[in-house]
């Protein structure tokens, strides 16, 4: 049995409730996304890496159910900001922080634009950390 076959069997195990099935699906698909993201970074394919970030967030939101409406709003707003390839929830879930993959030359401006859009949309302040 190959690894993908074993993963699919784990997802489809008849003993799993619907909730547990979604949790297993997230873990299996997230492991695949991590491997694909490493490959995308090695190939300097930031568009692909951004797509994988967005898919990761969708899985965290829908399958693992650890996102919040505020974080989901922030991720949606990020999709409209030029220079941001993708964004996802990070940390333990249930709010807190996102990590965004952005063009280096636009990172600070993109982060400020995102925080301003979030503040204007929700009334909540945001804090940005842009690595040097």
What are the roles of these predicted feature ranges?
Residues 95-101:
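Short beta-strand->loop micro-motif that forms the acidic, two-metal-ion catalytic signature
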């Amino acid at each position: 049995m190959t690894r993908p076959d074993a993963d699919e069997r784990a997802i489809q195990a008849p003993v799993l409730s619907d909730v547990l099935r979604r949790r297993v699906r997230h873990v299996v698909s997230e492991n695949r996304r991590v491997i694909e993201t490493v490959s995308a970074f090695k190939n300097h394919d930031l568009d692909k890496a951004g797509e994988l970030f967005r898919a990761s967030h969708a899985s965290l939101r829908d399958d693992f159910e650890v996102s919040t409406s505020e974080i989901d709003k922030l991720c949606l707003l990020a999709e409209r900001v030029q220079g941001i390839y993708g964004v996802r929830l990070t940390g333990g879930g249930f709010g807190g922080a996102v990590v965004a993959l952005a063009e280096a030359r636009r990172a600070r401006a993109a982060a400020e634009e995102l925080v301003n859009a979030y503040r204007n949309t929700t009334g909540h302040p945001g804090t940005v950390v842009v690595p040097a």
